[in-house]
């Protein structure tokens, strides 16, 4: 475990820092104006972070001309979200293809994928071995009041709907704890097997799929995920002017449905793992139709050459010959070589949006999960980082108080959230107007926490990292001290982005 500790003293009363009813440091200029002395810290890109194991920082002292009543100290960290830890394959052992996650509420988590039987693969020149005979037994599982049967897979059970025959598409599993999974049967059919995303709208699951593969998103509306039958097929939802799809859907707090979609108009996607430098963005009031395209969420195209070239897709004309007479598509050649992303998944934490997807770097290097962030889904997203190896086709969900990043590889990931521990704070007050601190609070660890928002699967409440000062004495000056300890085993570290001291 890394034990990097930073001691940071910030007197938030420097010149040009007082504005209205708060004192704020939140930009490069603010930090530079506020700092009186520092050792062992880097102040860059509007943040403060440790250069080594320890560091110190003091800001210029400035006193108020009258007593003020402090309410709280709030600390905000960088949104880069590198605080991920690997875990063994998440979800049912026999879930196949790209996993799709859906959080309905506390203790009500769903995972969708194709149903595999885990039949042993045959060695070359040999016949495949048969699965050992298995006799299901009646079972009970906390949180499930329906009849259950054991399965040949550990921590997995069949509900009545799970005994229905498959239809060649995706199946549904439900969990109360992200450890034990109950199979409820098929939710899509063979032609709709290219499921990319799911959302929760007014008590119904919206299950989105490409038809044909890598083309216009279609949608099922399922008001009963327990019956082992697909819901109502509403047909095409997004008429995509480009090729690519592999779309992720997210509903905003106003109820609008947003889609983030691959756009292959500037790349030979067949040579780049069917990914693209462009992520299109469209929005609909109902998630069923009427999607209007906006500016791209991600646009990392290089220079267009004006040359038009073609590539071939293996599925279009075969799967939907009525709408697609050919498998050949055009694209405009761009130079130099471009990064490519895709298989999008989205989540929003306290208004900060994140896009997770495939990351296929230039030069033929290994694929991984990459992610972007933006303070608004209507603004361009900026690159954060990457993790893992292999073609991920990821999805993300908030469950059991933490965040799960599922991939189609053997390794998945879990995170407590974008906040990186450990930050301990105390505040001092000058009550006598002599420029010296008369009283300090105790040292208190502060950190963000996260919670569900009723009725929303991918919108997560952020509770800020704050110190309550409402019972603190009034004063002419206030001083803040922070201790920051990097307690993670991953590459993340606490990066302080802003401090805000608020007053009555």
Annotated model-derived regions:
Residues 116-121, 212-215, 264-269, 360-364, ...:
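Short glycine/acidic-enriched loop and turn motifs that connect beta-strands
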Residues 24, 28-33, 37-63, 80-105, ...:
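Surface loop/turn signatures of beta-propeller and other carbohydrate-active proteins
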Residues 214-217, 223, 254, 259-286, ...:
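Surface loops at the rim/top face of extracytoplasmic beta-rich domains
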